């Protein structure tokens, strides 16, 4: 079918199959990279927004035939190749652009809005952006960007302070500046994996299990293999016989190596049955229908209680092999195992695992005398709190593209962990690490989900077998049933306190549901107590962590990494105890909270796959100022008058996070001086939209006294950078950042040495000076001149600084969330009127990006608290398979008064006093909202997310108690 239409002012003619989707035509044939597919045509995400005959519409909702004769405008029409449009510049300046995946579409929508309404109201903004799913940024900064763009329409030279500034003694650190990669993302320049896929690439489509628990008894792929255009079919019969964990963690991984690329036993709906590798997506999908499979359906276990039950069906019944530290009864454990060929599970070292009891991992410990502490208490509360299954929902689905370059395998990946991908894939497909080149492209959102290896190994194996380029991309349905998600948890907390509110003992029993595989099954749940108990230092503390296998869809890493569930349970228990004692919740928090300098004794008993080498302390903590400021902002002590059926309540939660994993992880960096006096940084860090490349560039420029524009960062490329553990555990700033700072300092020493020689002065008399000078007492020399000298035949060789960063110290960001809700006692409706997130991340390296991280993380946490959940039917079949039914929030769902604040402290671990920022924001919304709900209407909601039905049910119980 021939189509003729006008695209960005030019006539276009394309030939496309009848019934083709307009988004695919614009992206694949017209190479409009701004028209991206995020939700498979559901029309929810808005990343495919175009102007169609002057109106904003999602291209995926159009069939190609509707393009005939149409006027189509995409984000490529904004600005020019090397010049941002007014709206794009405002978005970049304010810090809206993080992962960037749907920001070109956002820029087009906002441009259309300002064309129609040069000074739009909030309602007009909300209406215009109502079709955009902006998972990473949290929406709030769009108002600021639109206000800035509107002001510049009237005055092109209009300037305003984008964000507060910090550290007057520094040039770059603590000052706002655009992300170094923001322009290319908002302009839709090719930078994501899908932009790299070659036209001759084969396509993988996966046949997945329809059952939560089953064994394949017959598998016939012969008809699929015989289909024209099918190149290969991968099954458990011809895949590598290698066991691994999908979890992207440092080796040896603290997770069971409990999966094979394909296995006979299927452990969740969506588990892999067979992969068709074909010349096109259409052929691959057709071939899937030709595969014949017979299953022996097994009883499923879907929750912790079922998994713990005596004689429960076993999710993993295969033999167990230990690499070290095998338990004395291993032979007895294996005696009852089921042998299917050579299937087995590998455990690297003891993690408290008993798979044949559905126990994936466990850990326990205590400090002090818990029994004595409870005996000293005047009041004790013991409660159980639960969380549901939440999904990360990155706007860019998982995607991979692989090809052979000679005898080397090249992997373009949307990943948080390029070096872990290289190590894992090389082992799985039988290659050496130097034969595998992983290129982390820009990542359209991760939030933990792209820490795991979920499709890279299949794509790599297909390329190795066929010798052809191959691409594999998840559908949004696959994101829900085959991607990882947040662990479901059930946490029992017992807290005792004296009459004055002093906590005397805490006992936390943390039980987690890891689903079908054990990736992160030790480390995520152990962070539940590890990132909540230290907020309330107590002499007598006990914790127990047990993680169980089940047949729900997979779980894994998600921002907060266990902290949200532990913090919810502990905050709620302390709030309930405060009520029993007749003490205000905020006063109870103030009375027991951590203070700067406190020894965090409980962390001496909790490791993350390895016991700590020392007991950490709160080296920097701005909670005193945070709580004072939050109390004033939310008017904590002011009256809360009812409004008809609406009742007003306020709540608070304090939060903490780590900044990397001491004694386990490592980062490396190299900084090279170029012959014109500029610098290239080879950073192993993985920027997944957090602005890490900008942080690395700013740290380098600060040390070397040069303009930020003189620093270029190459990162996340295993051929062209140095090893780094990747983007997880809030490690970017402290680990990758410190490595960059140390490498720059190493180079600085060499520059000063050779600069002093060129000036004929002692090294002690010279220093670096802005912009790019070595200055002595008698004269100065430019870095360009020095670098040119280095490369001449009589020079001293190119100047390169390198550094490795490891540490045994912890840097803890702290914060508090304050919420004000209105609850309708007739309908149960919850309205989040105010939400204030105040965070201490040390010295903010880039303030506007830090604020964006807070808004995005907080909004995800609000979604988890009020609307988001993966649901199952009574047979264990997941019902949630798209963003809309999942309940992901949009701009109309944000609090009407939503503010974020940076409260600085000076930490000694991070570079220039910086601490992490990206994860901590998800840790506090649930308890802040839940305690506010209680303050409003008197009910305690102990399972999140919170629903009107829960409130009405609990209000009914209160009425029954009152009338009894």
Question: In which residue ranges do the predicted regions lie?
Answer:
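Helix-loop-helix junctions that connect adjacent transmembrane helices in secondary transporters/permeases
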Residues: 316-429, 595-678, 698, 806, ...
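Thiamine diphosphate
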Residues: 423, 437, 442-467, 471-473, ...
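Intrinsic disorder at enzyme termini
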Residues: 10, 106, 129-193, 630, ...
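Flexible, low-hydrophobicity surface segments
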Residues: 150-341
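Extended active-site and interfacial segments that coordinate phosphate-rich ligands
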Residues: 184, 289-302, 416, 423, ...
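Glycine-rich loop/linker segments at domain edges
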Residues: 95, 175, 181-187, 249-252, ...
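C-terminal catalytic domains of large/alpha subunits in multi-subunit enzymes
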Residues: 237, 337, 430-437, 465-470, ...
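Signature of N-terminal electron-transfer/Fe-S-associated modules in redox systems
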Residues: 1-165, 392
